[in-house]
């Protein structure tokens, strides 16, 4: 069972977090903060599956709820509020275990917000919006654009990330295909793209001949573990 924490976001509100660490496995020395997507909080099957699976592979995994999810609201807050929440969580985790390599990331929206706080600010950005210092960023299903709106790219900040970035993407993801991500990654400083052949935005494969979802997810977890291991070497 994960340890449960309460993290104060400001003087009036705290959000819940969970820490997954499997004492039976060899510790990698790395922590991954994994943020949820827009439609489901940290207790969704996807989030719990990945938190448990990655902790079984030697990572210390921290999940949390963005404020809107903690409050039971369906619509996400605007990006500045999401970023501020993620920054508070990152600062708390770093203060708690400063000796560990710190990675941030998430599913879909959670991964996008992680990339945004890891990116260097543009001239004129507000104070307090500088890049958080992390060992790397993991995006599981990066939402490059809204479905059916490929002209509305969410990529301007990505070249400003100096830390290594791993993007795991379904080849049939309506939020961004391998072809669409290619030119974006070419402009990034240290980016790795892992494609799930036939995969959708949830990294699942819908065809009848596809492997079971847990087998696909296990392969993704192995990819994340191996990538983190190479980064911290």
Residues of each region from the PLM?
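Serine-hydrolase catalytic machinery in alpha/beta-hydrolase-like enzymes
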Residues: 5-102, 129, 203-211
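The conserved beta1-alpha1 loop
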Residues: 33-37, 141, 169
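Short alpha-helix in the alpha/beta-hydrolase fold that links the catalytic acid
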Residues: 47, 151-154, 163, 176-185
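Primarily recognizes the serine-hydrolase "nucleophile elbow" in alpha/beta-hydrolase
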Residues: 86-163
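Short beta-strand/loop motif that positions the catalytic acidic residue
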Residues: 160-162, 167-169, 173
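Acidic catalytic loop of the alpha/beta-hydrolase fold
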Residues: 171-175, 201-202
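Catalytic histidine neighborhood in serine/cysteine hydrolases
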Residues: 187-205
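Catalytic active-site module of serine/aspartate enzymes centered on a nucleophile-bearing elbow/loop
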Residues: 207-233
């Amino acid at each position: 069972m994960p340890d449960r924490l309460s993290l104060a976001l400001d003087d009036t509100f705290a959000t819940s977090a969970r820490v997954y660490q499997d004492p039976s496995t060899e510790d990698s020395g790395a922590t991954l903060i994994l943020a949820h997507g827009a439609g489901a909080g940290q207790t969704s099957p996807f989030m719990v599956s990945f938190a448990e699976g990655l902790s079984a592979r030697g990572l210390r995994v921290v999940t949390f709820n963005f404020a809107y999810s903690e409050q039971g609201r369906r619509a996400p807050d605007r990006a500045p509020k999401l970023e501020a929440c993620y920054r508070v969580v990152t600062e708390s985790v770093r203060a708690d275990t400063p000796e560990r390599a710190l990675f941030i990331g998430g599913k879909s929206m959670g991964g996008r917000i992680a990339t945004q706080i890891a990116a260097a600010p543009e001239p004129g950005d507000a104070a307090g919006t500088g890049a958080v210092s992390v060992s790397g960023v993991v995006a599981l299903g990066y939402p490059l654009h809204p479905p059916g709106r490929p002209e509305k790219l969410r990529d301007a900040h990505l070249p400003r990330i100096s830390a290594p970035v791993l993007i795991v993407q379904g080849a049939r993801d309506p939020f961004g295909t391998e072809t669409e991500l290619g030119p974006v990654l070419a402009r990034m400083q240290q980016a790795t793209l892992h494609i799930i052949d036939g995969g959708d935005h949830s990294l699942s494969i819908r065809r009848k001949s596809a492997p079971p979802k847990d087998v696909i997810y296990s392969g993704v977890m192995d990819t994340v573990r191996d990538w983190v291991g190479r980064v911290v070497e």
